[in-house]
Amino acid sequence: MASQCPVKNSWPELVGTNGDIAAGIIQTENANVKAIVVKEGLPITQDLNFNRVRVFVDENRVVTQVPAIG
């Protein structure tokens, strides 16, 4: 019986890192998603998108929340 390697869907290790670098790491580790850097507090759509990872950053572009698919 063959086992499948699960696709990575969240990146808790990136909290506290630079958002632009985090977005690059996410797209390298999961080529099926587009990582989008978003300043914390800006309005966002509430739709669920399995091809998107939002990387929330503060005013210093530091990741403030766990990036995850959605």
From Swiss-Prot:
<keyword id="KW-0007">Acetylation</keyword>
<dbReference type="InterPro" id="IPR000864">
    <property type="entry name" value="Prot_inh_pot1"/>
</dbReference>
<protein>
    <recommendedName>
        <fullName>Protease inhibitor HPI</fullName>
    </recommendedName>
</protein>
<comment type="function">
    <text>Inhibitor of serine proteases, strongly inhibits subtilisin A and weakly inhibits trypsin. Does not inhibit chymotrypsin, papain, pepsin, pronase E, protease type XIII and thermolysin. HPI-1 inhibits subtilisin A with an Ki of 0.21 nM. HPI-2a inhibits subtilisin A with an Ki of 0.08 nM. HPI-2b inhibits subtilisin A with an Ki of 0.1 nM.</text>
</comment>
<comment type="similarity">
    <text>Belongs to the protease inhibitor I13 (potato type I serine protease inhibitor) family.</text>
</comment>
<keyword id="KW-1015">Disulfide bond</keyword>
<feature type="modified residue" description="S-glutathionyl cysteine; alternate">
    <location>
        <position position="5"/>
    </location>
</feature>
<keyword id="KW-0318">Glutathionylation</keyword>
<dbReference type="GO" id="GO:0004867">
    <property type="term" value="F:serine-type endopeptidase inhibitor activity"/>
</dbReference>
<comment type="subunit">
    <text>Monomer and homodimer; disulfide-linked.</text>
</comment>
<dbReference type="InterPro" id="IPR036354">
    <property type="entry name" value="Prot_inh_pot1_sf"/>
</dbReference>
<feature type="modified residue" description="N-acetylalanine">
    <location>
        <position position="2"/>
    </location>
</feature>
<dbReference type="Pfam" id="PF00280">
    <property type="entry name" value="potato_inhibit"/>
</dbReference>
<keyword id="KW-0722">Serine protease inhibitor</keyword>
<dbReference type="GO" id="GO:0009611">
    <property type="term" value="P:response to wounding"/>
</dbReference>
<feature type="site" description="Reactive bond">
    <location>
        <begin position="46"/>
        <end position="47"/>
    </location>
</feature>
<keyword id="KW-0646">Protease inhibitor</keyword>
